[in-house]
Amino acid sequence: MDTLSVSGHKVHAPKGIGALFIRDSVRQTLCPPTWRHQERGLRPGTENTPYIVGLGVAAAQGQQKLRPRIAHIAALNRQLRAGLEELDGITLNSPDDAVGEIVNFSTGCINSQTFINYLNTRAVYVSGGSACDKGEPSHTLLAMGCADLTVRTALRVSFCADNTAEDVDALLAGVRDGLKELQHI
């Protein structure tokens, strides 16, 4: 691995902290970053020590719980996929060997934002894509060759260790009910 970036909130650390790893052999080929006027433009401002400690603690705790967390999320992923496969009109966009934390599927007939709003009223929260592509069609789905309708009706589910089988049941019930209620709009 040459580079790795980590957003703290993705590993249950404080929002606003992150880490960047760059292999020495790669770092030597890069131009140094510039950060305004601090430290001759080579360093950012004052580090947020509590957040740095929080990221370290979250990383250590995450490492200790990694295997059971992966198994738990894999079980939730299988439960969701099995439930979605039973619903007419649903297309699973995530391949079987995709990362376990994310499942992407399309309804094929109901705009993503309409379905997101419907699920929100049931306290079920999903997205229409990744945060970095908010409001834009999914570049990933387009690159996979998905049809425009598939992309416009896609929903993205993200799992974490705090999710439960009951959460998946609530999501599946919401999708099932939403398919019935929203097709007539």
Region locations from a protein language model:
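Structural signature of PLP-dependent enzymes
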Residues: 59-81, 91-99
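Conserved C-terminal alpha-helix-loop-beta "cap" of PLP-dependent enzymes
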Residues: 103-155
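Short beta-strand-to-loop capping motifs
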Residues: 22, 105-109, 159-161
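PLP-dependent enzyme catalytic core of the Aspartate aminotransferase-like
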Residues: 139-185
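Active-site PLP attachment segment
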Residues: 1-37, 44-57
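A general structural signal for well-ordered alpha-helical segments in protein cores
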Residues: 14, 48-52, 59, 77, ...
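Thr-Gly-centered strand-to-loop micro-motif
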Residues: 6-8, 15, 42, 105-106, ...
